[in-house]
Amino acid sequence: MDNKKKEKSEGEKLAEKLLSDKKNGGLRLSEEKIKKADKFCEGYKSFLNTAKTEREAVIEAVAQAEKAGFKPYEKGKKYDAGDKFYFVNRGKAIILTVMGKDGLDKGIRLAAAHIDSPRLDLKQNPLYEDKELCLFKTHYYGGIKKYQWTTVPMSLHGVVIKADGESVTVNIGEDKDDPVFCVTDILPHLADAQMKRPAPQLIKGEELNLLIGSRPFRDDAVSNKVKLNIMAILNEKYGIVEDDFVSAELEAVPAFKAQDVGFDRSMVGSYGQDDRVCAYTALQAILKCKDPKKTCMTILTDKEETGSDGNTGLNSSYLPYFIADLAKVYGLEGRNVISASECLSADVNAAYDPTFSEPFEIRNSSQINYGVVATKFTGARGKSGTSDASAEFVGRVRKLFDEHNIVWQTGELGKVDGGGGGTVAQYIANLDMNVIDVGVPVLSMHAPFEITSKIDTYMAYKAFSVLFAD
């Protein structure tokens, strides 16, 4: 038998030199690195279970930051290279900073992720009784397929501000002994009329009512006995009355925990991975950032799922104001610092799904296990509502990733004219900063249970880390 290795043909050599040859990360990475990815995602799963809302994500980020030596930001203070600090915006967004050796005039390296996710928010007057069942009226937040959110165990998170100004934290449905809540649905035997509705109306917004109780208060002198009984329970537990719902922010989210998916445990399934998969990886990158050349920031922001409007979203001015305050101490203009800066908009993309392949253009779609995905633009139709990263900046990011052996890919959000979406990249770009979306491909995005690859998640962490180290 001839044991000589077959020599490559001229065509094979030329193809190897000239043509793209993307490979699954599971084939590119060593077993040791795959084990590192798996271990990294254990911490990620814990984060998903702890930080199910934007407020909880900020609380967890602060706890981890302080453990890593970060201090609260002091406006007007002159910071030295290596100093680490954080700024919290209204309890719903956070900026974490590590000062670099170069001056701020050389710009900032920024990773920007969002920590809000689709959910069901309680209305301001949510509590009612109907046919001796007690329910909460909800108003869905973000873009959802409403039918996916019925018959799912839900927990309730948020804050209630009482009439005297006291703030009460609510978190019920997460502990194993807690009750859960649920949006009901009609049985198939009686669903003839429902099944004739168009898919977007299969479940209507006003039908997303959360079932919260059924036992009456034992007093024939009162009406709405079940409602009264539920309110009595809430009063005993939290000290609130019905009018306190007016000044409350309560969010119903899926109650199940993050879990490994697949016989090979290669994926993570959980609520809220858009965009907490990028929030966690960007957070870990800044926490482990030491003595960077350039000043580095991770921003975890709110309101992306509803357009980034509001004073905790990146369509507001809190980020440029923060940079301006920081720059002023060094005699610099904030706008000049921003213009010299670079950002990875840390947001997810849709992973190619072979079961639902029609909306995807396979040559330009991201895939599970092919690494972190760089998305040059998002938007819709003729690239409306997006930042389109320049070839020069894409080339800069490409070179950075390749030099550091990051497993990465490119992807668009589906076919042209097939729909669309947006990220915070457009608002960062509007500040006059170079930016490109870099994130993790997600299956079943915006569903109560989303799926990501452990390899892709780990590569996102490595991608943000090399930006900070550059």
Question: What kind of region is each of these model predictions?
Answer:
Residues M1-D470:
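N-terminal hydrophobic/helix-forming segments and targeting peptides
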